[in-house]
Amino acid sequence: MKTLVICSGGLDSVSLAHKMAAEHELTGLLSFDYGQRHKKELDFAQACAKRLGVPHQIIDIRTIGASLTGSALTDDVDVPDGHYAEETMKVTVVPNRNAIMLVIAFGVAAAQKADAVALAVHGGDHFIYPDCRPGFIEAFQTMQKHALDGYADVKLLAPYVHATKADIVADGAKYRTPFEATWSCYKGADRHCGRCGTCVERREAFHLAGIDDPTSYEDADFWRATTQKRNA
């Protein structure tokens, strides 16, 4: 099945790209520049495409992102420290981000005669991000069947939607994902901060999967305290 992967350059989507390359016919990686402060992630997506020998396209939607105000990922708002399961992390929501990206990706896939679009949403995202939940994935697929009716039949693949990030790490290891060549941190500095929600989740995922984390963190121990606090 000819598959186009939406790839941010993060651990989840790069692992997904390696999985799709092994299980399907990977036709390319599609990334989005929406004005995110951690734009350096796109360099890791480019490196992934080169490694897998497929085209990489970056869609510039910064003018759209500029209208989706109030998120710590795009605006001058501090990225909070802590676990994703905390209410404070809702400031990292970019309204309809996945929906917007998927609409564009399905159009690109249809134009390129691809059979599927793959997205790396997972169970750990459900608490914070509405457009990462199973209900959204199912509804979006239904909508696209109507939107492309008579023109193309493009499937939405979300193999991790019921999985944990630890499951993704295990799957990534299975498909030899070079984890050191992925970027997660929302703060976009030279090193992973180790304190933002995505850094904490990343570090915890490696621990739970029993796989060594090759990532260099500014604060390598913060995740323990915040996960213990969450589980207390």
Swiss-Prot record:
Pathway: Purine metabolism; 7-cyano-7-deazaguanine biosynthesis
The organism's place on the tree of life at top rank: Bacteria
Cofactor stoichiometry and binding remark: Binds 1 zinc ion per subunit.
InterPro entries, sorted: QueC, Rossmann-like_a/b/a_fold
Keyword check for Ligase: yes
Protein's UniProt keywords contain ATP-binding: yes
Binding sites annotated in the UniProt record for ATP: 7-17
Family (UniProt): Belongs to the QueC family.
Name of the protein in its database record: 7-cyano-7-deazaguanine synthase
